[in-house]
């Protein structure tokens, strides 16, 4: 395929030719760095430049049929399987405290680190997320932001390892997943 995929509108320069160009808007509203405003400001150019624009942002999805819904991120797990479970609960987090959800996640992890296994940047770093999920029956997942169309690898990685997510994120989680497998 002769295509280019860009994760930011301002980075959309190509080497020329007849490549089809696609834009993927991945960050939550709290971290988009003005991407949504920039896209709206240059909407005609965006629509002319890109074959499709993939996003979870409901505001952008209303602008044109070229905007297509997709989860904010994919899956970081390499070995999709329902693995045997030998441990009770984990949480993958970081020491970031930039948003309210970061604070909730961090405070919960620190308050419960003697009861659950806590992993993540600045806490107990792991080389891959499988280490913090594969052996665990449950994992606490708190998204960086909470709105209807936004969820990330935090919940998807649990499904990919057969781990039940204890989830704080989109209030419309039932529109995307069977909630019998989510707490």
Residue ranges and their predicted role:
Residues 1-183:
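Nucleotide-sugar donor-binding catalytic core of glycosyltransferases
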């Amino acid at each position: 395929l002769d295509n280019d995929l860009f994760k930011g509108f301002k980075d959309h320069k190509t080497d020329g030719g007849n490549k089809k160009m696609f834009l993927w808007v991945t960050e939550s509203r709290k971290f988009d760095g003005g991407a949504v405003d920039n896209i709206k400001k240059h909407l005609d150019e965006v629509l002319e430049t890109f074959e499709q624009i993939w996003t979870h942002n409901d505001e952008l999805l209303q602008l044109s049929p070229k905007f297509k819904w997709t989860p904010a991120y994919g899956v970081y797990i390499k070995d999709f399987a329902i693995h045997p479970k030998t441990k009770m609960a984990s949480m993958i987090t970081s020491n970031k405290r930039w948003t309210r959800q970061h604070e909730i996640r961090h405070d919960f992890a620190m308050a419960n680190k003697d009861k659950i296994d806590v992993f993540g940047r600045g806490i107990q770093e792991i080389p891959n997320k499988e280490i913090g999920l594969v052996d665990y029956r449950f994992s606490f997942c708190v998204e960086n932001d909470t709105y209807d169309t936004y969820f990330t690898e935090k919940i998807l990685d649990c499904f990919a390892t057969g781990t039940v997510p204890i989830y704080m994120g989109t209030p419309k989680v039932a529109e995307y997943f069977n909630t019998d497998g989510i707490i």
